[in-house]
C-alpha cells in the first residue's frame, strides 16, 4: 500500500514538473515571437525610409545635371507638366519600377489623379503610372518587397515673392515661365506585411492623391491614409 502511494506521489510530482516546463516554454516562445516582431518592424521601417529617400536623393542629383533637369522642366517633363496653369493642383503619378533605372519620369509612363468635386479623376492619362502590387515588375527591386508610388503636384497657395522663379532668371526668362511650387511625395509600402488583398491595395494607390485635399470643407484621405486603414 505504501509503494502505491509513493508511486502516486511521484507521478503527481512528475506531472507538475512537466506542466511548469510547458508554461515556461510557452513564455519563452511568446517572448521570442515578440522580439522577432519588433526586429521585423524596425527592419521594415528602415527599408521603407531607404526606398523613399532614394527618390529624393536622385531628384536632388538632377540639379547638378543640366540635361536631366532640363528634361524635367520641358512641357512633357514632370516639373514642366504639373506647372502648366491647367494642371495646377493635379497630381502626376509614377511607379518606381526596378526596370526603369534611368527613365523614371517619362510622361508616357505617368498617370494623373485629382479631385473633381466629390469625385476622383484617375484615368485622364491612363493607368501606367499606378503601381500594381500583383505585378512583379512594379516593385522597386528583385527582392519583391517594397512598392514606391511617386506623386508630383504644383500649388499656388503659400508662395513667396520670386520664390517661384528659376534660380538666376528674371520675369522674362523662358517666356516669363515659372516653376511654381512643386511638391514631391514618395509613398513606400510592403504589401506582404498587410492582410489586405492586392485589389484593395491597388484601389488605394489609384483612387487617392498623395496629399490631403479639402473639398467642400471635407478633408479627403490621401494614399497613405487609405493604406493605413487597410492595415
Where in this protein do the model-derived segments appear?
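Aliphatic-rich helix starts adjacent to a transmembrane/signal segment
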Residues: 2-4, 13-51
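Residue-level detector of alpha-helical recognition elements and their boundaries
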Residues: 30, 36, 66-67, 74, ...
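N-terminal alpha-helical signal peptides/signal-anchor transmembrane segments
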Residues: 48-67
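Short, glycine/small-hydrophobic-rich surface segments
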Residues: 62-97
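Intrinsically disordered, low-complexity regions enriched in Pro/Ser/Thr/Gly and acidic residues
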Residues: 96-231
Amino acid at each position: 500500500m505504501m509503494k502505491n502511494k509513493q508511486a502516486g506521489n511521484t507521478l503527481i510530482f512528475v506531472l507538475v514538473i512537466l506542466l511548469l516546463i510547458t508554461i515556461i516554454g510557452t513564455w519563452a516562445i511568446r517572448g521570442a515571437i515578440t522580439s522577432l516582431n519588433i526586429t521585423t518592424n524596425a527592419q521594415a521601417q528602415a527599408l521603407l525610409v531607404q526606398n523613399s529617400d532614394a527618390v529624393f536623393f536622385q531628384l536632388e542629383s538632377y540639379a547638378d545635371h543640366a540635361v536631366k533637369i532640363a528634361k524635367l522642366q520641358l512641357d512633357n517633363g514632370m516639373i514642366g507638366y504639373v506647372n502648366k496653369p491647367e494642371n495646377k493642383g493635379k497630381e502626376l503619378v509614377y511607379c518606381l519600377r526596378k526596370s526603369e533605372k534611368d527613365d523614371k519620369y517619362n510622361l508616357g509612363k505617368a498617370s494623373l489623379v485629382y479631385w473633381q468635386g466629390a469625385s476622383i479623376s484617375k484615368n485622364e492619362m491612363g493607368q501606367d503610372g499606378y503601381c500594381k502590387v500583383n505585378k512583379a515588375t512594379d516593385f522597386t527591386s528583385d527582392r519583391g518587397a517594397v512598392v514606391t508610388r511617386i506623386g508630383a503636384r504644383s500649388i499656388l497657395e503659400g508662395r513667396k515673392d520670386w520664390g517661384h522663379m528659376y534660380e538666376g532668371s528674371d520675369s522674362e526668362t523662358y517666356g516669363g515661365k515659372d516653376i511654381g511650387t512643386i511638391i514631391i511625395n514618395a509613398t513606400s509600402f510592403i504589401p506582404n506585411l498587410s492582410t489586405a488583398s492586392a485589389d484593395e491595395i491597388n484601389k488605394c494607390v489609384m483612387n487617392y492623391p498623395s496629399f490631403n485635399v479639402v473639398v467642400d470643407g471635407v478633408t479627403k484621405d490621401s494614399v497613405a491614409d487609405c493604406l493605413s486603414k487597410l492595415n
